[in-house]
Amino acid sequence: MTFETGGPRGNDIGLLDGLMTNRAMRRYTDEPVADEDIWTCLQAAVQAPSGGNIQPYQFMVVRDPGLRIGLAELYRRGWARYEPAIAPSEFPNDAVREGWERNNRATVHLAENLEHVPVIVLLLMPSIDMTVHDDEGPMPVGPTHASVYPAIQNFMLAARSLGLGTAMTTLHRIYEDDVRELVGIPERYEVLALLPLGHPTGKWGVAPRYRGADKITSWDQFGEKRTP
């Protein structure tokens, strides 16, 4: 099965086409995003499954230019600390080095231009402990985040179908308290993710992955591999 690579397309793309060709977009034009398209992405997001249908999230859509500048400044402060901390001292081969450098250039571009993206969406999650207990003790069924990430994925796929690009970022969390203060988010909410939303300058396509599904999948017993 093959999937298309190319520029923006309408909402006639198939589900698998969207899944296989959606990728993090970090370069955007300054073309506005229509309210209708924002609502479509939000409505798709809330249709995502969540544990017990609890929908443990809130969305904040930021379009005000001053607020976008403020978020961008906090994002850049975080990136200035984060980039040198993750820079590898060596690479196993040239392909890995080239891939890292290409991704880093795109990440730097987003950090330097975030305020120019027409829409920034923040994903909020209440800071609550969902652990339940019985007579035998706590039952650690996993963090609440597991019921938020599917909504983020739905949002991103809906954007893809509309010819819009986005990327899930978390660098803002380095200065999360400042982000809350800037846009008036109560302290009880964790600002889980930041998603730029706009018209991308790049192309969609099947992104290169260094490990295919056959390399990271076991069948019945850990380490038992199959070929597709």
Show where each model-derived region lies:
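Short catalytic-loop micro-motif centered on adjacent basic/acidic residues
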Residues: R27-Y28, Q58, G165-T169
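Glycine/small-residue-rich phosphate/adenosyl-binding loop
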Residues: V61-S147
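Glycine-rich, charged/polar anion/phosphate-binding loops
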Residues: A44-V46, N104-H109, V179-E181, K203-W204
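Small-aliphatic-rich amphipathic alpha-helix that forms the alpha element of a beta-alpha
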Residues: Q43-V46, V121-L182
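C-terminal helix-cap and adjacent tail motif
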Residues: T2-N11, M25, E190-P228
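Generic N-terminal amphipathic, Lys/Arg-enriched alpha-helix
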Residues: G14-E31
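A glycine-rich helix N-cap at a beta->alpha junction
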Residues: A80-P92, V183-P208
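Glycine-rich phosphate/pyrophosphate-binding beta-alpha loops
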Residues: V46-I54
